[in-house]
Amino acid sequence: YQYSEELAAKTKAKPELVFHGAFEKMAKIKKGRHSVDGNKDFYGGFDQMPEIVPGVKGNSFQFSQDYDHLNITDKIIPSLEWTDPFSLSIWMSTDKRKKGQSQTLIANTGEKNSLWRGWEYYLDDQNRVNLRLINVAPSNLIHVRSVDSLKLNIWHHLTLTVDGSGKTEGVKLYRNGKEIQTEGVIDNLYKTIKPTRPDIEKGFVERKRDIIIGRSYSGFLGDYGLFIGKLDELKFFNGVLTPFEVQSIHSENSEEKEKIKWPVIQKHLVEKDSKILELKKQLKENREEYLKTYAPITEIMVMREMDKARPTYLYNRGNYSEPLYTVEAKVPETLPAMDKDLPKNRLGLSQWLFDPKNPLTARVAVNRYWQMIFGKGLVATPDDFGVQGQLPSHPELLDWLAISFSENWDVKAL
């Protein structure tokens, strides 16, 4: 739109506020369960509960124990799909920063036997803000991370928006009303992120799983991603907040009343235009259809190359604590060299194995078939064609069989 101000009369309200956790009070419902803010679907599931302390607005909850985390049932926030646009904001302050230990803010990811499927919003061991939408870790997911770390022992207003594209570029992270610089760690999501459980007959089936606050379901994190600090004013929206809305929500509980600039308002008006909203609705339907197309496709576990090969070493007598020098991906020098055009990976190795200039593959293969049929190979040491192995009993026959076999690798003809 050339003149965004023309949209002022057409603009719609902010996305639907699905849930507001004020972190004001707790009440015991029964043994081992407490409701939060009078909502039985927002609860603590153990006798340990967070401490109520002053917050940015009224009270906040101080998390400091192993089992003082909170849960939100799917009656409030249903299981999300990566095609679902959503936003959330929360005030937080932490005094924890420990190498190798993350801190879960809010998540519903499972553990290893559930493929870690779900979504998680957390701080890593450098207190960088992270979001992951996961089908199966570590391959089918997106992972976005802030570049800078959060300072300890001060309040931060964190906001997250996800546009439903399933791409890292569709994730925005904000701190105190302003977008922060991020980096895409992994960008490869194309299947569902709804929680799952193993099933003997069906493999994996969809299941309901509460959203968890202040702790992870995943034991592989070592400390279960325990959050140590204070949380306040959690808001969850069904849709994408614009930068204008993010700043507005931040100013509600902030002493900093910064004037919102006109370009931010213009962008907001464009995003809320009825035509734009209708196009986004159609786009969401197309993405859902795309997801349905991929859903029935069965995938199997195979090896894949690393993006960047890690160093490989020759070790002193095989002792992993005593590397002598690095080695490269090559073939034995006593055999024909690998073509320079071949990649130095498993594909290149397979092409080299069946290269007509390589005499070893066909000779070893026909010798093993001879051994399977007659009980003893033409070479009596089938595992050793080197200098310590035995010579072939009928070398000309072995040569003829190997040459004939390598012409088309036809086992039946052999």
Predicted regions and their residues:
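Extracellular glycan-associated modules
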Residues: 1-298, 307
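Primarily short, surface-exposed interaction patches in extracytoplasmic proteins
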Residues: 38, 258-413
